């Protein structure tokens, strides 16, 4: 088990002890390991970005409950061109994304585009700026808790609940507006 296990845990402060009875230490006790993540999503974003040059020193953290959906997001920007979004529903990795990722992207794009328009940053551009442009260098971890998740596909790795789009959109928009 790698040290990545606990960092991936979305529940900050949880401590996990593992004992492997198949492998013994020199004193005859089972090999054991302890995993602890104090920082939860923020720590995970820092871990994902540890080899990249940060544009923002500390990740932005969002925690809200909207439409009875608890939403947690940690995000940061780095100097790469790639977007790296990791998402979870009820602690299940939804590596194909889904409605919670759609809500996040929609809110981020709308808020940043509105800010750029109002500040005049886009006036001299001869091209239309898209959501992909705002997500270059973005690292984000999204975690939602959904009472009755509806997963799409056989692998159940994509959230299909349409109401979650609005919940995540609203939570992310509200906090992003504070930065504009």
Q: Could you say what each language-model-derived stretch is?
A:
Residues 149-166:
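Short, low-complexity, polybasic intrinsically disordered segments
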Residues 13-154:
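GHKL/Histidine-kinase-like ATPase module
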Residues 162-178:
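Flexible helix-coil linker/hinge segments at domain or subdomain boundaries
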Residues 143, 179-180:
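An exposure/low-complexity boundary signal
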Residues 2-6, 179:
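Short, small-residue-biased leader/transition segments that mark boundaries at the very start
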Residues 4, 96, 100-103, 164, ...:
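Short amphipathic alpha-helical segments
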């Amino acid at each position: 088990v790698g040290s990545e296990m606990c960092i991936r845990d979305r529940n900050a402060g949880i401590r996990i002890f593992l004992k492997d009875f198949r492998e013994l230490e020199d004193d005859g006790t089972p090999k054991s390991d302890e995993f602890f993540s104090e920082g939860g999503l923020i720590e995970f974003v820092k871990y994902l970005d540890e080899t990249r040059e940060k544009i923002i020193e500390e990740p932005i953290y969002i925690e809200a409950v909207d439409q009875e959906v608890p939403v947690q997001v940690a995000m940061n920007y780095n100097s790469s061109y790639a977007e790296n979004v990791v998402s979870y529903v009820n602690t299940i990795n939804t590596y194909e994304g889904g409605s919670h990722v759609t809500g996040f992207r929609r809110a981020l794009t709308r808020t940043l585009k509105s800010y750029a328009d109002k500040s005049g940053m886009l006036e001299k551009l001869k091209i239309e700026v898209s959501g992909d442009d705002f997500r270059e260098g973005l690292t984000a971890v999204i975690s939602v808790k959904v009472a009755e998740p509806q997963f799409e596909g056989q692998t159940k790795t994509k959230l299909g609940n349409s109401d979650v789009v609005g919940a995540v959109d609203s939570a992310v928009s509200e906090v992003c507006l504070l930065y504009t």
